[in-house]
Amino acid sequence: MNKLITILVTGAKGQLGSELQEIASRYENIHFIFATKSLLDISNTTALNDFFKNQTIDFCINTAAYTAVDHAEKDSETAFLINSTAVGNLVKACSIHNTKLIQISTDFVFDGKNDVPYKETDPTNALSVYGKSKLKGEGFALKQNHMVIRTSWLYSYSYGNNFLKTMIRLGTERD
């Protein structure tokens, strides 16, 4: 019998967290814990430590994020709290409890000036508050040898505003 792997997914109400919940039942050897902010506020170090003390978690996929790119320019404090400070808290908890963190990030850590697709080894140059906040969170994860996955324009049919729905909306609004 294979060992059951436990994966904590933060940001369970967001687009990526919701989609991971949709497919979780396909994996019999994985026990998923889907954490919304009400279950686990990753900006609260006490809550994080208590949560991790009570169970063994093999992996944590952090999908929790402040993703309102334009609004982040006006609310940088919240963007940095969620995208960097909270990530730093999560990194500490994962490191203490031997949990491997997979931090979900963004292509906004780059300046967009490349004519070819970016590689993970390319220099970063975040221009926006959102990009800078995500880059700082990446730094916390990478310093402790955790993983970072950079995404761009996630899309899904069932979840809120995303690339697919934005393109459909723009296509119907423009001549």
Q: For the regions a protein language model found, what residue spans apply to each?
A:
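NAD(P)-dependent short-chain dehydrogenase/reductase
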Residues: 139-175
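NAD(P)H-binding glycine-rich loop region in Rossmannoid oxidoreductase-like domains
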Residues: 45-82
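N-terminal Rossmann NAD(P)H-binding glycine-rich loop of SDR-like oxidoreductase domains
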Residues: 4-27
